[in-house]
Amino acid sequence: LDKDNKGQIYLTIHTGSRHLGMLTYTKFMNEANCESNIPYELKYIKDHLAGLYFHATKACMAFARANRMCIAKTIATKMKWDCNPIIDSYHNYLTVNSIDDQQFMILRKGACSAQLGEKVVIPINMKDGIILGTGKGNENWNYSAPHGSGRTVMRSMVKQNHTVSEYKKVMKGIH
């Protein structure tokens, strides 16, 4: 749960389709690798595969959204809460944008959409919560905002170097 500066409480659910998205990406990159001798680091998905990949990523996003909505509905029902409005914020995705009757694609890796007036959710961490903001629609920033504060240590390193009891101590009083 998070609270804004006006006292409004928000239920925040941070999930995605990380594994499904990785499988989707790997499948299409492997297919692209079959089509030429370009080194993997320089590979890109093109032509018919690009269109299929775009639709596959949309399916991953729909899966992630459905997952969040199911979690939210379960919590809201059990707690007898009215969870409106819902701000659904994606990150790490490909989208088609239309500005002034022109269409273009934006790949957002570590970023979320921040169109003019759009509600923006920027997760900081489990302890400090999220930033709720409003998009500025800045063309120089690809109509985007950062998604999170970034990770300074890989998850695997955290698991190796920290304990659950340390985590509980840091998170004491955080609900």
Where are these regions (language model features)?
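Domain-length cofactor-binding catalytic modules of enzymes
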Residues: 2-175
